[in-house]
């Protein structure tokens, strides 16, 4: 085993004060806030307690700066963080032999990296139509830490929600969703590809005194589906098959032969195009491939840093090729006051574009209340924007989200179903597709205490009511107003009375029936009544058939004007009774034909006058009689 010929000179500063310590451990891994523990040893309890508990405990919240540097060579590594815990340890050990009892007199100063400021209270936040770079910038800005953000995924994300999690947990989940690197390098928070990665070559049995390689066969063929409602487009995309290089290509080839099926799940993120979905799947495929191979080792060089690249080589005398280049995803540094240093690291293939995720958390969103902030969908797709209670303080809302309805679909070029869009200010229940907080939709509306109306006594009424007062009421009260009523806010109604078996149509002004053909048919009686005028206009023929008697009563004058011929055919008698004068003016000829006898009787005087000649012809006898004299004059 190699000798530690180049010890490390460690330094710990707490609020600028150089601290003497017994030992130091710094644990670092991707997707974590890191953890350090500094142990200060005291010769006696008196010496330790003279520091006073108050002074020792006041170390909490101190700014910590830890530096590793080889005494003879190498670039120093610096880590900054905050003290979060202090433990004063005056504890008697329990050895196997009583005479070897030992009491420790130690103070443990424990802390995390700068990014712990992002890992505070859980909360909610939202981002609309943003890229990852914008989301990371806005989420981390209040903490005032240094951030380097260069994600490979540059698509615009319609809606992203931080859901009951700290900012750090939210960014962790975001990095997992989009398969982006996410780690703290000791000074800077990295999201995406780092601008530069420190590289170091490690020689086995010189720099590396323990080494382990691990290969695992995993399925890496992926596909996903997604529905884009704005364009009514269903996507199903496959990820690229990355064969990898070096040792990884061998492992992946074996895995592909073992697992010949393909994963098919919904997209991990809502996307707006098939190219964005393709980018996500390509990255996921590479990430899965990279997780098949890893190395683990122990070294005595502090140049092995998180996110850096290590290449493991073998002495030339062994004739073994290099194991390749690996990105450090975990490293634990240990050092004592004398500079005796070692670390334990884990690496995954650096030539793989994306690394194995070290995030194992998950979030499932549950339905919650919101208020409709707008229903003026710019694309007229029947969507709304809603505002959750937690969004009100920041004045935020969701993006345009769809509204669930009992029936919805399409018929040709138009939509079909129940088109009921909530109004601004309405309370709605919001659900999330797949439990994903980034995919909200309106499940339905709810009444508030000041707005709710029940179904009346016996819960017999079902009502559809619009904001202007139009309503349809279904009444199931068979002992009351059983039926259906359609009414507008002006009092126009259509009432279908189930109890009276009657339909009543009522209007404040006009009722207009307009159609190509209209038929009114009654088994018994049709009644028409007008309070004033009654007009009938017929554009063509007018026909009236009465199987029995017909009567017409006009209490005022009656005028009948016929521009064409007039014909009156009666199978029986015609009685004309006139209470006053009767006058018949004929502009043309008049012919009166009687198939039987005809008689004219007048109680008064009869005058017959002709402007032209008059002829009375009879095929039989003609009698002119008078009760008195009869005069025929010239």
Model-identified regions with their sequence ranges:
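Surface-exposed cap/loop segments at beta↔alpha junctions
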Residues: 50-147, 159-160
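Acidic, low-complexity/disordered segments
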Residues: 306-374, 454-456
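Structural signature for extended repeat/solenoid scaffolds and their inter-repeat hinge/linker regions
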Residues: 310, 367-601, 605-609, 614-615
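Short, solvent-exposed secondary-structure boundary/capping segments
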Residues: 87-111, 334-347, 379-385, 439, ...
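Juxtamembrane "anchor/assembly" segments of surface/extracellular structural proteins
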Residues: 1-62, 67, 114, 201-206, ...
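Short, Lys/Arg- and Gly-enriched loop/turn segments at beta-strand edges
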Residues: 72-81, 317-327, 435-445
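Amphipathic, non-transmembrane alpha-helical segments in extracytoplasmic/periplasmic proteins
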Residues: 38, 111, 122-147, 162-184, ...
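Short beta-strand-centered interaction patches in the first periplasmic/extracellular domains
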Residues: 106, 113-115, 151-218, 439-443
């Amino acid at each position: 085993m190699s000798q530690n010929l180049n010890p490390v000179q460690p330094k710990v500063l707490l609020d600028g004060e150089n601290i003497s310590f017994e030992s130091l451990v710094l644990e670092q891994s991707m997707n974590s806030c890191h953890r350090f523990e500094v142990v200060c040893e005291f010769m006696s309890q008196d010496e330790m307690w003279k520091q006073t508990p108050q002074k020792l405990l006041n170390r909490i919240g101190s700014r910590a700066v830890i530096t590793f540097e080889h005494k003879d060579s190498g670039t120093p590594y610096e880590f900054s963080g905050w003290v979060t815990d202090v433990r004063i340890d005056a504890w008697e050990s329990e050895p196997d032999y009583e005479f070897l009892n030992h009491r420790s007199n130690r103070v443990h100063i424990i802390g995390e990296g700068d990014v712990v400021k992002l890992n505070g209270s859980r909360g909610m936040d939202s981002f609309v139509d943003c890229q990852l770079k914008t989301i990371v910038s806005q989420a981390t800005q209040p903490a005032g830490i240094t951030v380097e953000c260069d994600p490979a995924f540059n698509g615009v994300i319609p809606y992203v929600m931080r859901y009951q999690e700290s900012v750090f947990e939210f960014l962790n989940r975001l990095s997992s969703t989009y398969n982006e690197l996410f780690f703290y390098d000791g000074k800077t928070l990295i999201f995406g590809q780092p601008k530069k990665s420190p590289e170091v070559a490690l020689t086995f049995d010189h720099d590396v005194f323990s080494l382990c390689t691990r290969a695992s066969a995993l399925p890496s063929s992926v596909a996903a589906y997604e529905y884009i409602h704005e364009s009514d487009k269903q996507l199903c995309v496959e990820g690229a098959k990355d064969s990898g290089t070096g040792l990884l290509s061998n492992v992946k080839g074996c895995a592909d032969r073992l697992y010949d099926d393909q994963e098919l799940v919904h997209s991990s993120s809502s996307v707006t195009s098939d190219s964005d979905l393709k980018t996500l799947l390509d990255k996921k495929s590479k990430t899965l491939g990279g997780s098949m191979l890893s190395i683990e080792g122990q070294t005595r060089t502090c140049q092995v840093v998180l996110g850096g690249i290590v290449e493991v080589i073998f002495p030339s005398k062994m004739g073994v090729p290099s194991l390749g280049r690996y990105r450090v995803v975990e490293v634990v540094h240990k050092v004592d006051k004398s500079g005796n240093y070692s670390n334990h690291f884990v690496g995954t293939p650096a030539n793989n574009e994306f690394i194995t995720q070290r995030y194992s958390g998950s979030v499932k969103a549950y339905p919650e209340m919101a208020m409709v902030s707008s229903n003026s969908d710019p694309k007229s797709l029947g969507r709304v924007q809603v505002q959750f209670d937690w969004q009100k303080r920041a004045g935020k809302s969701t993006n345009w989200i769809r509204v669930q309805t009992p029936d919805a679909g399409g018929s040709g070029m138009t939509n079909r179903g129940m088109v009921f869009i909530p109004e601004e200010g309405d309370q709605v229940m919001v659900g999330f597709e797949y439990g994903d907080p980034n995919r909200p939709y309106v499940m339905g509306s709810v009444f508030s205490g000041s707005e709710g109306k029940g179904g009346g006594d016996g819960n017999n009424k079902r009502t559809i009511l619009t904001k202007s007062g139009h309503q349809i009421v279904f009444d199931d009260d068979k002992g009351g107003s059983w039926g259906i009523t359609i009414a507008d806010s002006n009092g126009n109604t259509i009432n279908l009375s189930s109890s009276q078996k009657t339909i009543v149509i009522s209007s404040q002004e006009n009722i207009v029936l307009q159609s190509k053909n209209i038929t009114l048919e009654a088994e018994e009686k049709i009644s028409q009544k007008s309070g004033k005028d009654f007009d009938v206009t017929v554009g063509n023929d007018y026909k009236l058939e009465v199987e029995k008697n017909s009567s017409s009563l006009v209490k005022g004058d009656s005028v009948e004007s016929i521009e064409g011929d007039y014909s009156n055919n009666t199978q029986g008698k015609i009685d004309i009774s006139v209470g006053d004068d009767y006058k018949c003016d004929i502009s043309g000829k008049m012919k009166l034909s009687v198939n039987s006898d005809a008689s004219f009787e007048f109680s008064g005087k009869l005058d017959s006058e002709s402007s032209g000649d008059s002829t009375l012809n009879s095929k039989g006898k003609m009698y002119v009689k008078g009760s008195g004299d009869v005069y025929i004059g010239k």
